[in-house]
Amino acid sequence: MPGQEFERDMVHAWNAYAETYGKKLIAYRHYQMRYQPQLFDVLVDSRPNEFYLALECKSIDPSTVSQLYFKQHFSAPKGIHQVIRESEWLSLSGRNGFLVVELRRGKGKHTSCFFVPWRSVSYNFKAGEKGIDSEIITRCPSCDKRGGKYTFDDEFIEQVVRMLDSYPKDAKKAYKKKWSK
């Protein structure tokens, strides 16, 4: 299952980043309870707001779809669409949300993931768009999969932090805080 594997890859990438760069954060999969709607796939917990994240992971083959469709790639149990449910949860929890889209390009080509700010997802949904166009997705911060895994560095994380909805948005200040080892 590409989706579940991608979720595990995200958890490993965030936890490896924390270990490598001495950040106090922990990432884990947010498992779906039976008969309950799921809220985000991966959560990242940390005292600094910069790493207090909720990630919705989608893994797609770009040769088969031109965009990420709201009806096809998101759920709507009990008539409440996943984007609405997760947007409300972000508002209540204070987390920063990202739609992390993995583009599987096939054998011999590199696989990449893109961090789309949740505000873009919510805006497109509320505007009545069919989905999120590939142009929007590919303009967001991205990371390539190498050696079978994603590896984040400070430069990539700074790009992600600049996309946050809440403050502070200065990644350098986040790194100097007492929360670093």
Predicted regions mapped to residue ranges:
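Conserved catalytic cores of phosphodiester-cleaving nucleases, focusing on short active-site segments
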Residues: 42-44, 51-63
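Mixed-charge (Asp/Glu-Lys/Arg
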Residues: 83-90, 148-150
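Acidic-basic catalytic patches of nuclease active cores, encompassing PD-(D/E)XK
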Residues: 1-36, 46-48, 180-181
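Short beta-strand-loop-alpha-helix junction that forms the active-site gateway
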Residues: 57-76
